């Protein structure tokens, strides 16, 4: 019984006894059939025949020479042998010796393979020659040159080795990255298609399923059958693609075609192809033949990867390649190599190998070819030795293939992620042409290479100007942390905002601690990303220090305390995200991330010590909220805090600070798209609770300050001194506000008055802040303006320019604002004191905040300065600029009669008309993005309703309308409870007010447009806190109020309403009875809150009415039924 032949790699041991050859008793003896057996096993044979193929051994075993080529591979000492004397003569003996020497030299290339035989063949077995070359070389080494059959085999092995050498040289001259694309292009050029390993296999099996029983189907029916079966698993399957697969089988002659007159032909599968193995082999053979026709030389391992997606079909593909080889294919390959050398210039002088290759190509490979002569044998083996030496020399010294693989292509993410197929299956179908890393070493190597790359183009023109004007953008980056720009190609920047995939990911902390909370890392969405399917990228890898194109703040953050205080050591770095960065894909408009900060009360004053100030916290970009359970229309609700980088930053990473402040608007606002509706659980809690409540951290987006670069050069001056509110004195408010009425006692009235005075003093101090000494920001082109302030619907096409330049409103400085207020007040109702002035410190602070808001809002334009009179060009509130004309409303002063005995205070409508324009009480064409800040006593609830109204001109959904109606009902119920506490007189006063409000509500109102201008107030947090203190004061002084004062207050409200009837456009104010408690008593600090409360609180009611009116239903009855709305602080 024949012995099973061993694997070709086990050529150093006897296939019978499996013992390694040696020079003593187990000398390797090669037979004429190509098998090599040790001398001991050969002597034990019962008959002189090969134990594997039973080939007769014609020569005496004792006369067969030892295979010295194998002995040198096992490291044995080659014994001196008696020179073999051939019967044909001495000349033939010389030829034999020369041929034997050639084989021994070629066998040395198998030395790395032999050294690894004990541990198995793995990646550490590095050899200059490829595996096909090694395999053919092993065949040559096993040939017995003494026997005639051995010489025939040696000549065929030499020819095969030479042909493979030509193929290797051609492979060295072709681009492996383009190999697969060229192959499939050649396949498609012939009307065929390969759908991928998995899909192609399924398609072939379905074809076999339809035709294996010998049935004849038309092409159309066959294609439809396959497509219908493939669709559940492969939705991309189409009739066209499957038709191309059938065409591939048709070219392979797998069908027996029956033609029919005036009808489609019927196809029947040939009997020899009615098994999957036979059909697949013919299918693969057709693809290999197409590649050969196209002049492509593809290795068997590459074929296995391309057609099967693994490395287990190399021998299958090799057999197909060998079967398709013809005697003419060798000469054709030599011609192709000549053409390739002409194209490259032949730097290695490979043309010298051409005569040897032609000699090998002329060898007859047929089995019945005559045996070669000794001279032909010598010439053939010398030629193959020269050719193989030339290949090895080219690979070692002139090959560009290895260097090409070291250089990543133009795509910056080349091999920076692990290959998914390699991780999951252990093999990659793309082989060397795969653009993903196949090992951790390769991954780290290319990531390091990419870190040294500089972005190929700046993020925007404005960022280039940062460097042109010499601003210190690069020195801001610390040595310890940098931005990973290498793995991300900077895309084009529409409208100056970095689009999805932007290279900028994080601004660098100034400190030495590049800490980064893991919860701040953006989540990578695989279905939106074009990166590798493997591990997600680390967006915060270190990057070069020379990144000057980052949109960083060129101005250092000023100290956060008074200038006379000693500076505190900064122990926490400032982490910011530049404006232009996109941590999230552009399509990710409906996913919001959770605020990483801990839970904290929303408005509880932090227990800071007086005289201390705190380090700014790291600011992160756009933390979006969890997906809503019940979506609401309109933009998401946003917390309103000052956008100033210097103003409202409280370090949220200190464990000792329980208070967190939500941001004013999304820090990373992308103005090019409309944000989806959100379900505001916290807003519903606001509506249900009449008292301020704390906000859970999950609903509080992280605060992000506004980048200063976004402003024009005219805004070079902004406060460098800290806001007084940052020095937060201790305010002993023990019980924090909660969602339910707190059982703990409230602060005393004296404490509330004292705290109010402190806040008023801090608001007053803001007036004297001097401009900073550093240089102004550079003039940025309009394309880089952050577009939060523009209509989102217009931003996509860039149509907001018309709104910017077509209208003008001189509302950007203190001079013009007061001038307009004075001019408007003169022809209208005159105040009791006869002059328009701000009698209250709080009113001044509010006015300054509003002016600061307007200045910041309109400075997104790049118009020239327009001086007015002899006033300074740039006021302390910034430069005069242009914005929409409709921002100015000539509604006249809104005046209320002050209580008797209280200081007279006038309130100009210009002080509040900005809110009408911004919030939707007038004909403003702009829509705020739900981030209108509070002014004075403007409360968060007010802005929530404004956010609801600001639906960008889109009708509110039914859920929003029901929510608004429910809110009004709840507020009316709370109002009725509050009014019952005041007694019969308060009830009667409320009825009088109700009748008056109903009369006003019956008047026609101007058409409402959605508000579109978001406001920003730097002192907003102080205003909120002041509002809380005043609410407490109102509650404490409610029992002490005088009945006659209540009457006076009611008269003042009626007088205000009458002003609107006397020719003034009614500002749609509805007075909220619950907040009348704030005005029923004298307020400390020499002012009464009656007038402001009437106007401010009534604006909330009008915003609610606008929210319902914007539906188109005009349902105002709910809000007009009582004329009051709850004043719950957010």
Curated annotation (Swiss-Prot):
Gene deletion effect = Mutant animals are born at Mendelian ratio, but die within 6 hours after birth. They displayed a curly tail and malformations of the caudal spinal column. Lethality can be rescued by changing the genetic background from C57BL/6 to outbred CD1, which allows about 4% of the animals to survive to adulthood. These animals display enlarged spleens with a trend toward increased numbers of eosinophils and monocytic/macrophage populations, dramatic and selective expansion of CD8(+) effector-like T-cells.
The record lists the effect of residue 579 to G as: Abolishes the formation of an alternative cleavage product. Abolishes protein cleavage
Q: Summarize the impact of residue 560 to G.
A: No effect on cleavage
UniProt entry keywords in alphabetical sequence:
Cytoplasm, Metal-binding, Phosphoprotein, Repeat, Repressor, RNA-binding, Transferase, Zinc, Zinc-finger
User: What GO biological process terms does the UniProt entry carry, in alphabetical order?
Assistant: 3'-UTR-mediated mRNA destabilization; B cell homeostasis; cellular response to interleukin-1; lymph node development; negative regulation of activated T cell proliferation; negative regulation of B cell proliferation; negative regulation of germinal center formation; negative regulation of T-helper 17 cell differentiation
- Region (ROQ) residue spans: 177-326
This protein's name: Roquin-1
Gene this protein is translated from: Rc3h1
């Amino acid at each position: 019984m024949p012995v099973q032949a061993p694997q070709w790699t086990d050529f150093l041991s006897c296939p019978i006894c499996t013992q390694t050859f040696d020079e003593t008793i187990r000398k390797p003896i090669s037979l004429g059939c190509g098998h090599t057996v040790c001398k001991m096993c050969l002597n034990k044979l019962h008959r002189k025949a090969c134990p594997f193929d039973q080939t007769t051994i014609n020569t005496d075993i004792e006369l067969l020479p030892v295979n010295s080529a194998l002995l040198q591979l096992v490291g044995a000492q080659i014994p001196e042998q008696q020179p073999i004397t051939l019967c044909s003569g001495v000349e033939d003996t010389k030829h034999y010796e020369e041929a034997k020497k050639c084989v021994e030299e070629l066998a040395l290339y198998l030395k790395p393979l032999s050294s690894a035989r004990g541990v198995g063949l793995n990646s550490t077995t590095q050899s200059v020659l490829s595996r096909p070359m090694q395999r053919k070389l092993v065949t040559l080494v096993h040939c017995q040159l003494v026997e005639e059959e051995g010489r025939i085999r040696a000549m065929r092995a030499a020819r095969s080795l030479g042909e493979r050498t030509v193929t290797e040289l051609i492979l060295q001259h072709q681009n492996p990255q383009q190999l697969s694309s060229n192959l499939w292009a050649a396949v498609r050029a012939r009307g065929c298609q390969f759908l991928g390993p998995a899909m192609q296999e399924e398609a072939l099996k379905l074809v076999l399923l339809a035709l294996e029983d010998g049935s004849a189907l038309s092409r159309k029916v066959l294609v439809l059958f396959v497509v219908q079966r493939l669709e559940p698993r492969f939705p991309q399957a189409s009739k066209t693609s499957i038709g191309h697969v059938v065409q591939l089988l048709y070219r392979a002659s797998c069908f027996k075609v029956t033609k029919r007159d005036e009808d489609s032909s019927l196809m029947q599968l040939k009997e020899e192809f009615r098994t999957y193995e036979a059909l697949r082999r013919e299918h693969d053979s057709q693809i290999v033949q197409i590649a050969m026709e196209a002049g492509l030389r593809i290795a068997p391992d590459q074929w296995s990867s391309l057609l099967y997606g693994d490395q287990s079909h190399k021998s299958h593909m090799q057999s197909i390649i060998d079967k398709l080889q013809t005697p003419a294919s060798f000469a054709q390959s030599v011609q192709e190599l000549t053409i390739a050398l002409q194209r490259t210039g032949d730097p290695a002088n490979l043309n010298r190998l051409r005569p040897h290759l032609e000699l090998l190509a002329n060898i007859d490979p047929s089995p019945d070819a005559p045996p070669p002569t000794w001279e032909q044998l010598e010439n053939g083996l010398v030629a193959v030795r020269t050719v193989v030496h030339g290949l090895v020399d080219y690979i070692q010294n002139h090959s560009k293939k290895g260097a090409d693989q070291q250089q990543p292509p133009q795509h910056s993410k080349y091999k920076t992620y692990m290959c998914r197929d390699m991780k999951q299956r252990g093999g990659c179908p793309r082989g060397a042409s795969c653009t993903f890393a196949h090992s951790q070493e390769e991954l780290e190597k290319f990531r390091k290479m990419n870190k040294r790359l500089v972005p190929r183009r700046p993020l925007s023109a404005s960022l280039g100007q940062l460097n042109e004007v010499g601003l210190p953008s690069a020195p801001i980056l610390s040595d310890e942390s940098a931005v990973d720009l290498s793995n991300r190609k900077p895309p084009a920047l529409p409208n100056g905002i970095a689009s999805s995939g932007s290279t900028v990911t994080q601004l660098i902390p100034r400190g030495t601690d590049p800490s980064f909370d893991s919860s701040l890392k953006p989540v990578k969405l695989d279905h939106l990303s074009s990166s590798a399917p493997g591990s997600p990228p680390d967006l915060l890898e270190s990057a070069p220090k020379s990144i000057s194109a980052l949109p960083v703040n060129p101005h250092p953050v000023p100290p956060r305390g008074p200038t006379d205080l000693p500076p505190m050591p900064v122990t926490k770095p400032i982490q910011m995200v530049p404006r232009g960065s996109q941590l999230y894909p552009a399509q990710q408009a409906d996913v919001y991330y959770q605020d990483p900060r801990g839970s904290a009360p929303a408005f509880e004053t932090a227990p800071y010590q007086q005289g201390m100030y705190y380090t700014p916290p790291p600011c992160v970009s756009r933390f979006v909220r969890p997906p809503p359970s019940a979506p609401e229309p309109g933009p998401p609700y946003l917390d309103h805090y000052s956008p100033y980088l210097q103003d409202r930053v409280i370090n949220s990473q200190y464990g000792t600070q329980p208070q967190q402040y939500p941001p004013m608007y999304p820090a990373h606002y992308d103005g090019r798209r409309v944000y989806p509706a959100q379900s505001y659980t916290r807003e519903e809690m606001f509506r249900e609770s009449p008292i301020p409540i704390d906000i859970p951290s999950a609903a509080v987006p992280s605060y992000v300050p506004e980048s200063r670069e976004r402003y024009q050069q005219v805004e070079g001056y902004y406060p460098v001194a800290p806001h007084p509110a940052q020095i937060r004195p201790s305010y002993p408010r023990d019980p924090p506000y909660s969602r339910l009425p707190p059982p703990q006692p409230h602060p005393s009235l004296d404490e509330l008055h004292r705290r109010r005075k402190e806040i008023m003093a801090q608001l007053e101090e803001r007036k004297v802040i001097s401009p900073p000494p550093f240089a102004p920001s550079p003039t940025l082109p309009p394309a880089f303006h952050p577009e939060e302030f523009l209509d989102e619907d217009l931003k996509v096409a860039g149509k907001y320019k018309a709104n910017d330049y077509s209208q003008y409103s001189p509302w950007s400085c203190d001079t013009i604002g007061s001038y307009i207020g004075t001019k408007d007040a003169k022809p209208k109702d005159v105040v009791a004191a006869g002059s328009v002035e701000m009698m209250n410190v709080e009113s001044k602070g509010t006015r300054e905040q509003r002016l600061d808001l307007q200045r910041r809002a309109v400075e997104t334009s790049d118009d020239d300065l327009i001086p007015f009179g002899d006033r300074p060009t740039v006021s302390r509130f910034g430069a005069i600029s242009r914005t929409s004309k409709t921002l100015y409303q000539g509604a006249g002063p809104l005046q209320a009669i002050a209580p008797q005995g209280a200081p007279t205070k006038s309130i100009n409508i210009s002080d509040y008309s900005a809110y009408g324009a911004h919030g939707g009480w007038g004909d403003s064409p702009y829509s705020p993005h739900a981030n209108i800040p509070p002014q004075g006593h403007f409360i968060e609830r007010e802005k929530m309703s404004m956010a609801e109204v600001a639906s960008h001109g889109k009708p509110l959904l039914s859920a929003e309308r029901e929510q608004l109606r429910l809110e009004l009902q709840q507020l009316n119920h709370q109002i009725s409870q509050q009014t019952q506490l005041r007694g019969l007189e308060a009830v009667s006063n409320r009825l009088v007010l109700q009748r008056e409000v109903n009369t006003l509500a019956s008047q026609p109102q101007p058409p409402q447009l959605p508000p579109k201008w978001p406001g920003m107030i730097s002192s907003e947090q102080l205003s909120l806190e002041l509002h809380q203190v005043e609410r407490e004061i109102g509650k404490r002084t409610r029992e002490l109020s005088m009945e006659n004062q209540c009457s006076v207050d009611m008269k003042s409200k009626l007088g205000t309403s009458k002003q609107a009837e006397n020719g003034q456009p009614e500002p749609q104010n509805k007075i909220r009875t619950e907040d009348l408690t704030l005005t029923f008593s004298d307020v400390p600090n020499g002012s009464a809150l009656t007038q402001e409360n009437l106007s401010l609180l009534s604006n909330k009611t009008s915003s609610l009415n606008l929210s319902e009116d914007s539906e188109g239903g005009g349902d105002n009855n709910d809000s007009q039924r009582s004329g009051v709305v709850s004043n719950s602080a957010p």
